[in-house]
Amino acid sequence: MLGTLFFDKQDRELLRMINETIDHGPSQDLEHKVFDANLHPHGILELTTTHEYRMAHAVINLLGNLEAGGAPDRLMALRILRDEVLHSARTPFRYNTGRVLIQIMKEIIRSRQDELTQLKLVHDFRKVTSGNPRLVRQFLNTYHLLEMPEEWNQLTVDHHVHDANTKGRKNATHLIMDAWIKGIRYITVVYYNYVEPAAARELLQAAEIMGVDVRIGLEFRTPFRDRFVCFVWAPRGFSDPEAFLSFLAERPMVALMNEGRKASLWMQRHVMDTLQLWNAKHAPALAEELEIPVPLLEPEAFLAYVGTGQTSFLHLAEYAHKTLLKHLVQRVKALQEEALTATSERQSQIAQLIRRMDMLTTEVIMETWLKPERNPELPSPDVPDNAPDTPELLRMPPHVLLDWLSCLRSGYRITLQLAELTAEDVLELLWDCQGMITHLELFNLKEWQEGHLRHLTAINDLQIAINKGSVLHLKQILRGMIRTLEASSSEKDKERCAKFRIILRNIPSLQAPYKVAPLRIRIGTDSTSHSGVRHGMGLAMPETLPHGARRQIARGKQFRPIYLPVSLSLEFRETYAEQERYSFFMRWLGPRLRRIWGFGHFGLRCTKEWRAISGITQIGEEGNVITMGGIGGELNNGLRAERTEKTRPRWLGFSRLSTPISNTLKVLAGFIPALVTFLYTQEWWVLAWFGAPLWFLITGLRNIPQAILGGGGMWSRSLLRWNDYVSWTRVCDSLLYTGLSVPLLEYFIRVLLLEDGLGLTVKDHQFLVFSIIAGANSIYISLHNIYRGFPKEAIIGNLFRSLLAIPVSVFYNDVLALFLPFFTTADPLLILEPGAAIISKTASDTVAAIIEGLADWRNNRRLRYWDYETKLQRLFDCYAKLELAFPDQDILSLLSRPEEFTRLTSTEARSLQVESIINALDLMYFWLYQPCAQQTLTSILRTMTREERVIVARSQGILSRVREVSQLFVDGLLGRNFARALSFYLDSYENYILTLNKRCAGFSNGHRPLLRRRRHISDCL
């Protein structure tokens, strides 16, 4: 029953392909099919596979390639994934749709063992691809994600996170993908002591792909008053990832990284000593307490578990928990069986023992046995040691270390971490380091939750006093510190008191470095994606989010953030700039219109931006910064959870019904109320029995020309047929809502309100009756347009369509009144009066076909602009690479001779040849198969220079090399199912090249024709 009623055939086929890939891994052919970044999601790839499967394949590869050697594959998967999700939505709701799609795909992969859950998720996935804002917002709430502005200008940050190369769980690509899903725009990934070039390359390239602003920070510990203080050094001023990697390869940086590796190895020795102590002391004691065998930890296996990360106590706690968990499960199962026949006293003991085992989580192991303070017999890595084996980096005073770092790069940010520091500590460090500290990590979510930031208010007051340049305020703070130190009997406090008196006499020297560049702040979560008791990464400023997200935060139902005690000062900026490319008409019209009042910004591109003024920050009870991540899991091992057999439900809800059944029910749900209403309200048998079918016929016929108009099919010469433009699901939706409108318009409005309530009839008040019915219809349609996620142009147009429908209704009424006497002897008014709603409906749908068709046309044009923007940029990038690869060749001339071009690139630039062919194939597919593509490209070509049009036209000539292009298909460029794509290419390339050449040649720069019509196109291009 479930197999026929619920889910579509496409759902099951997609799930089968996804699970095959999860179980067996991608084959070489599949890798070719998915992982060529130059193939556009809306290009020729559509002829071979669905974008849903390509997304799934990309996510599987991204999450599955955890080994270091898989970084190139992960990056390629990320690039493909981003292109797929950003080009999937059919509405302007692109970014939020993409975030939901990736999240659903991750859930599909995680639910591998539950086929029903997977089918539900696949069905949801295919629905969300429409980009309906209502559906997207619903799933954002489901997955505890905040809606982000489509301008992607939100202020969301996290300046302290870790990836798998330190103590985090996620590799760099996975981390960036999850940051993008959450909507984080600015992120700093912190590495301890050193960073491997391979890790930096993956992180920077992944961030570049996803458009995330990422910085790499190196955390160093330095001794300060019998403890370590931490600094995060983030060099800056790099134009691209390669510039940063070149900086890492410089000799001074290599020396620093070598010293950093020594410091990390020193920490690793402490962790390994703790591992040995666990084996010798803690494991036997725990085994005796829990009455289970606690396995000893193998050092080699533990280091293999850490992998590319830097060994830490957190890794050790997780590894100990992992090795222990299976024994806990077995022991709990045995105890539960024993409890069935045990005495009540023994049952109480068993329950207590099971509770103890259930609470033995990673966090408990860490806090109870592995923290340095829990093992006083071992030297603590948190206490400075001047022993000979202590690395030099861990013995340097703060000012010496910072002086070394500042000499390596002129542009840098050095952030002081404030865990367990007082305002006196911060002041002394600022004085010692003489302005080299540029930022304070004023808020760290992990340290705050652990109670290590007890002096934030005093530190914040000190920062404000320094940044304001207020000598009086700073002097008051200093004098208060001196009074406190004077009251202490400690020798160290007396020594510090003398130092503070020196600072008091030299306040201008303390302020001087921060007059030009104020002492700024950083906020972060210190997220590792490991612990279930900590909030995940991401901090947001609600003022920068859309209204829906702010309402979601205020409700606090599915998304319950923490308001942090940090208030940032924000500024909002709008920048208007001229478009990069204008048509000749816009170049002439724009400046003239902008002189008129109210049109000052006509034709200008508006950029909206939020910015935090980090030098002005207040610490208080509740600020304007919230957490974006939730707590990862429960604080137990799940051993006490009752395991019940999952029964397959008989009913999965209307949203899970298969598309044919769902569409049938929609039509019936609309038709039955319409039929009943006409039978009840109409006396003439024709309208009583045929009014509802006529009503539906009007709507159905209206949707077809509307879809063709929206797809641009009336003017293009594409390969699309008329039914390719029509979405039958959308037609069924229209029939549902139009059927429900019959009781509204015919019964409640015309009969109850107008006739019975106000005494208004078509016979006596023709214009007024039609106006009221049309107005009610417009409001009703606009409301369900919003619900269905229609373009805003259609929604706004439908609000005003009653004004246009009124004269059309009167016209139709007069025409029918004129012609009805030829078909019947009855009074025409006796027929027209009960048919007023039908006439109004016909007029309204006539106007709607034009309004919604034009709205769909504008939406399709917007989608094609996105497609062409991406593909033409790649085409020109490829051309630039060719010019650089062959500096002695005239590439523009060579493109006009495809045979010579392929001969040259086959031997010296094979990858660029393949890229050129892919670009040409995608552009040909756009032209012949995508709605509104031909009109859109024509508009774009009109804004290009002559040279750019020549490049576009000549680059398509490579399609004439049938042997080379066909060989790519055979070699697996598009996977195994390439027959349809190859047939399309062979049938279409000649006419396409000729047509595009003519189109490119048919423009003029200024008033002169680009090419004379008598000259042969191929000679000119």
PLM feature spans:
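Non-catalytic, alpha-helical, charged scaffold/linker segments
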Residues: 243-359
